[in-house]
Amino acid sequence: MIFQSFLLGNLVSLCMKIINSVVVVGLYYGFLTTFSIGPSYLFLLRALVMEEGTEKKVSATAGFITGQLMMFISIYYAPLHLALGRPHTITVLALPYLLFHFFWNNHKHFFDYGSTTRNSMRNLSIQCVFLNNLIFQLFNHFILPSSMLARLVNIYLFRCNNKILFVTSGFVGWLIGHILFMKWLGLVLVWIRQNHSIRPNKYIRSNKYLVLELRNSMARIFSILLFITCVYYLGRIPSPILTKKLKEASKTEERVESEEERDVEIETASEMKGTKQEQEGSTEEDPYPSPSLFSEEGWDPDKIYETEEIRVNGKDKIKDKFHSQLTETGYNNINTSNSPIYYYEDSYLNNNNTGNPENFKLQLLDKKNENKDLFWFQKPLVSLLFNYNRWNRPFRYIKNNRFEQAVRTEMSQYFFDTCKSDGKQRISFTYPPSLSTFWKMIKGRLPLLSLQKTLPNELDNQWVSTNKEKSNNLNKEFLNRLEVLDKESLSLDILETRTRLSNDDTKKEYVPKMYDPLLNGPYRGTIKKGFSPSIINNTSIENLKERVILNRIHTIFLPNTDYQEFEQKVDTVDKKPLSTEIDEFLTLINEFGNEPKSSLKVNSEKKTKFVKFLFNAIDPNGTKSVKKSIGIKEISKKIPRWSHKLITELEQQLGEFKEGVSLDHQIRSRKARRVVIFTTNMDSDDPEVKEEVALISYSQQSDFRRGIIKGSMRAQRRKTVIWKLFQANVHSPFFLDRITPPRLFSFDISELIKPIFRNWAGKEGEFEIIEFREEQPKREEKKETDKKGETKSKKEKARIAIAEAWDSILFAQIIRGSMLITQSILRKYILLPSLIIAKNLGRMLFLQLPEWSEDLEEWNREMHIKCTYNGVQLSETEFPKNWLRDGIQIKILFPFCLKPWHISKLYPSHEELMKKKKQKDDFCFLTVWGMEAELPFGSPRSRPSFFEPIFKELEKKNGKLKKKYFITLKVLKGKTKLFRRISKETKKWLIKSILFLKKIRKELSKIKLIVLFRFKEISESNETKKEKDSLISNQIINESFSQIESVNWPNSSLIETKMKDLTDRTSTIKNQIERITKEKKKVTPEIDISRNKTNNIKKFESTKNIFQILQRRNTRLIWKFHYFIKLFIQRLYINLFLSIINIPRINTQLFLESTNKLIDKYISNNEINQEKINNKKKIHFISTLKKSLYNISNKNSHIFFDLSYLSQAYVFYKLSQTQVINLSKFRSVLQYNRTSFFLKTKIKDYFRTLGIFHSELKHKKLQSYRINQWKNWLRRHYQYDLSQIRWSRLMPQKWRNRVNQSCMAQNKNINLNKWNSYENDQLIHYKKENDSELYSLSNQEDNFQKCYRYDLLSYKSINYKNKSDSFISRLPFQVNKNLEISYNSNTSKHNFFDMPGNLYINNYLRKGNILYIERNLDRKYFDWKIIHFSLRQKGDIEAWVKIDTNSNPNTKFGINNYQIIEKIDKKGLFYLTIHQNPENTQKNSKKVFFDWMGMNEKIFNRPIFNLEFWFFPEFVLLYNVYKIKPWIIPSKLLLLNLNTNENVSQNKNINKNQKQNFFLPSNKKIKNRIQEAKEPANQGERERGSDIENKVNPGPVLSKHQNDLEKDYAESDTKKSKKKKQYKSNTEAELDLFLKRYLLFQLKWNDDLNQRMIENIKVYCLLLRLINPTKISISSVQRGEMSLDIMLIQGNLTLTELMKKGILIIEPIRLSVKNNGQFIMYQTIGISLVHKSKHQTNQRYRDQRYVDKKNFDESILQPQTQRINTDKNHFDLLVPENILWSRRRRELRIRSFFNSLNWNGVDRNSVFCNETNVKNWSQFLDERKPLYKEKNELIKLKFFLWPNYRLEDLACMNRYWFDNNNGSRFSILRIHMYPRLKIN
């Protein structure tokens, strides 16, 4: 088995070796190059298909393979590469050859020479085939879009050592691929032929000879293909003669003649010219290759000077005065006849832009008279054909405001050269060009023997050995220091040895630290430059000529120096390379450079010695002679610039180009039209006197130009590809997938989701129906609005399309303009007057008064205004400039509308008023056909017709006549009906009267008495008779009527029937009514005693009967009366009793209601009074803490009687407030492992997840902490928490609620008297009233407060015993032992925003506990949504900050109540006031939460600035300033207004209401403020257990800023005195100054406002030209064209007024802060700094670090991953790396990594995270001493953060590598991860 595994391992290793070998890689890459198909394949394919005979086929393949072999060889062999790979050959040879081929061989049968008997090799056709394939293989062009495959070999060649082997294997690989390809091609051809010959019958007759035709037309097909490639390459490689020649910058062309003869001519001979031209001729696919400055194929030392000069502003007039030459007399290895001359040009003239006056130009010149006639013929030819400065390719011309010419894009940011890396010679792509240049110069001047190459193995071994030695030394030193620290000795052995530069070994004199190049950090000062501009200005030119300046390059040659500065200590760890050493060493000898030459001539031994040494450095023989002065040349990479100063078309139109630039534009801008809308001084011809106001309007079509330069080829552009025949918009190919998604993979997600939700929809059908009913009208409304929007957008699109069409057609504008003018003339002077005449004549015909005056008045009112193409009004008479070319619009104001009559204007009707409102914006644009359109090119609108009101009026009159007619008809009908009815009634009365008379007669005839009821019968019978009679009579009448009518009516039969039916119905209805009334009468019996009846008995009986009836009823009543009275009394009593009962209840209810009203009234009155008081005091004391928690009065104590109000959080909170109680009693609750009845289990789990339980509360055994557990822990540290902005993007709802709850103001919720009455709290009302996103419910608020108190209280009780030295509970700023919450001292980035709001931060407010301000410079996040900042609102907004420190009896502090923002409309934006309130400074004041009052006033919709309370009060001062530009203001300015050092007595002397202006105080205040600002950030020193703070002496922290501030204040004072008239108040001037000085911002206006402004401008243009503009201005205001609110009528408007009006909104520009370079470096590299108290022995160096603050404003570095602890414990030494300096620390890690074999530190560190290896710490931890309680957590945290996740090391590995400096670019990191530290 072992043997088998051994064999298997060998096989695997062998396979790996084979795969990684050069041969296999070459074969692979060569095989890939087969697929880069070029035109040579076309020739080969044609030879195989068409040529007869094997000789031609063989010759074709032979030529093809030979050409490819030559190409492979040319990769390695430089001369062949130069011959074949240069664009000269391609342009000169390839294109003519292609054209020749096309025209010569454009025949059906070509190469048909017939059979010859000669030798086949001598046959011309075979040779031609061979040559064709060979030459086409050499041509470097490809058909496929990417030429990457063909260049793979070239790319891999860089990495390969054995290049010849690689090239040959690559060629073999290509040959294999080619053979396979040819075989496959042959098989295809054979298959086609066989297919044609075997199955001819299957083809239809027309297609029978298709393949034969194809073979015959092959020649033509190939020639067409070749022609296409020829045209393609003609487009890609333009003809040099035909392209447009741009005019070069005139100043660049003007050179001194002698210089011109010898400056750039050398470029033509050098290879650099070739490489530059190669960029021009290279293919489109790779337009930005990266050539090295020095290619490998034979280096020419002259090339390095062959870049073009950069002249700033073209000022080189005084150049000749600085000319100086240094002739070199002889060298051993350089031919003296061709020795170059150094020409130095001192470019002091560019100091206005570059800022570096010693940036000298160095050029290589030839001798004056040599080679003068050599290149005279070459220059015009070469520059004509191959001028690399010409814009043949579509490069972008990227301008820079500081320089004139644009940078050439072909220059790579990478620089390739060989360097030592990991002990091997490798090609580095980030090699510093200066070093390369330097090394080439040294090579040219040193003998060849000294430059012998060492073998790579030797170098590797040497590197490994030195690295081992260095790492061993480091480890030894490190372990020695650990042992010393372990012994706790305070000897100097702990100190790290520093290598210093010494002047003299014997005396041990060192160079001052300021100039010591071997020291770094705060020891170093600024290095003074050679010259300052003031010296240059003061000294004359002659002195400058005579000045001797040391050239830094020459100091590298120091063979026999008399100065021994470079003698160093034996320890070579900090030894730097020579180049950087000399760069720093020259600061020593700058003093010699600053003296004129005359002083050097004095016989001073030292100085002559020095000059001797300098020139001995160049040649040991000392044969040099100084002819003229030498200028300093900073070796730097020259940037090639274009020699043209190009301007865009837009710049030409606007006239924004400088002098010396050609007037014609070279860059094509987007298609735009410059429309002049107003010109002053029209009469004068002088263009300088004329002032034009112009608008630039862009066309709506896509921009196909994209800043292309004239003469460059559009086809070569990569990012604007046109792939369709007609393409509307131009797109980059990169985004094509976004524009047109593929159809195959596109599917509707909603269709997939529907079946999933079908079941749910079935279950909840009812709800769906209800929702549908509710949502249906909404949907319909939405549909309607969408339809309207769609139609509107369609119309707009159509309008734009019409406009573009008119613009694109040739001569369209001329035709359109002339048509419009004719239409306007026709309308105004012909059409409308003729209509007016016709109308009035018609009125006269109809006998009406004519309306000549009214119509003519309206006709005169109509104005035809000439407008620009975009509708900007000019005037009636003035035409726009170039209107025939650019187009014109005619706008009709008050268009005339012909009316048939005019209504009197005295009393207009309501309808007329409504019409007027609609016609407010009554204007239109004239169309080509004389119609009216609302917008230019819009659809014509319908005009109101003339005849419509006439027809309406006629209809009205007709209607009135109809009404009158119908009314008369009605009256007549009614009268006839009444007559009929009267006649009927009279008839009835007559009949009745007759009957009655008959009855009387009968009765009189009778003597007998007639009984009553009998008479009734008779009457009934009579009635029946009556009915019969009436029926008969009716019938008779009807018959008679019908007879009479039937004579007159033509269709009498039908009408008769109808009439009969009607009469029958009416009669029957009448009879029925009469019968019913009579029956009712019969029901009540009548007592009819006739007068004739004389029977008295009857009378008596009737009366008796009546009496009896009455008596019966009376007895019943008397019988029931007793019960009735009884019941009545009972009811009465009950009602009385109920009313008596209800009276007090009603009264109490009324009383309660009245009292409630009174209370409410009283409260509101109090609030009003309170507001009045606040207004007087300028303090919005809207809500206060009436009583503190510990001072609850007896009156309020009844609130807490109910135990339900008590919660655990409240109990714990009360206990925490009492300072006497011992919280250790509650430790059992937290230590109890099972569930506890008192403390909720959630809290315990919460702390377990936090990882902050003490070792007592958990297992004694250390857990193995992996990354997941540490993630949980780190989430609770704010520096690892995301900002609110990021969280709100991730989880919008949950996190936003949480953040809003944590960020809400705490001023009211802390009062626990209202623990359960949050709903009534004003804060919530305020939040509801606010127009903000912070919707937080009262219950969530309540829960959050509870949660917070739970966490806080349990946290306190857990860490109670160990509070003195606990890790988490003790802050870096802790001065008091009552502070509980941990906060990291690294306050950069997001901490101010991520901090939970409800922190106990009163202990942060002390004098010394100000954060190190410089660290906050990198904050860039700013949550605008939370802060609600808007300058558009006005109002009186102040904030009152209550700060109550938890001070000790021995400390005295002054407390300031800061007023944040004053009234904006009165005082300006940033007016700060300070209220001194000495009452709050009580010695024994208890702990009060940090409280922010105010900001609750509602102004319009929302307050200007919603102050959140996470900021420290120190920063609150200038927070309103800081919020606009938090990354530009120096953060130290935030501390300028602090008065925390004032005593109470001083506070008492200051009036409470005294306001101190922040920006323009008196001089005394300035000095006080600056003095206050000088106070350094307190280092937090405090003895353990002491209650007295150590006072820190103020140091010069802000020396730099002090000067700036004094300047600012002085400037503002002078500005104030100068500009008193311009500003209404001081604050406006202050604000102006402040914004200019400290802030960089852009003023933005809304889009809506922008549109309104443009409309206003259009109206202004018209009004300026009118003689009497009042009429038009009033009408335009009425129509809404001109908005008065944004009209700026005042002369001088300040910024504040503009912002108040809402016109301008301040928007910050995000810029990077220009930080101090040292500060960035130490912020990036510097790990933590151990506190002073631990390194008292290190004072010699450390004190220097604290005191030297001249350049480094304060050199104390705040820690990034650890805390500063004020006690003398050794926490920071748990991480051993903290002993070393940062540079040595990184060096130690990297060197230990190079030597390590096992890498296991990627996920976790085995030593520091394993329980078993904990004892390995004994080297630096004393096991005898007990660990502190929290030391385990600390160790885990630090060892987790140390080795695995040190990001600053990985990011800056390349930038700040130890012992070298290789530029600022990040290269590929070769360090994966450094392993654990080995302790032997």
UniProtKB/Swiss-Prot annotation:
Sequence intervals crossing the membrane: 18-38, 64-84, 87-107, 124-144, 172-192, 221-241
Acidic residues composition bias: residue spans: 256-268
Subcellular location(s) per record: Plastid, Chloroplast inner membrane
Keyword Plastid: yes
Amino acid composition bias (Basic and acidic residues), ranges on this chain: 1572-1590, 1601-1615
Record keywords, A-Z: Chloroplast, Membrane, Plastid, Plastid inner membrane, Protein transport, Transmembrane, Transmembrane helix, Transport
Top-level division of the source organism's lineage: Eukaryota
Predominant localisation class: plastid
Pfam families to which the protein is assigned, alphabetical: Ycf1
One BP annotation, GO: protein transport
Topology term for the membrane: Multi-pass membrane protein
Subunit structure: Part of the Tic complex.
Additional information: There is a partial copy of the N-terminus (positions 1-489) of ycf1 in the inverted repeat (CAC88092).
Functional description taken from the UniProt entry: Involved in protein precursor import into chloroplasts. May be part of an intermediate translocation complex acting as a protein-conducting channel at the inner envelope.
Name of the molecule in the record: Protein TIC 214
Organism of this sequence: Atropa belladonna
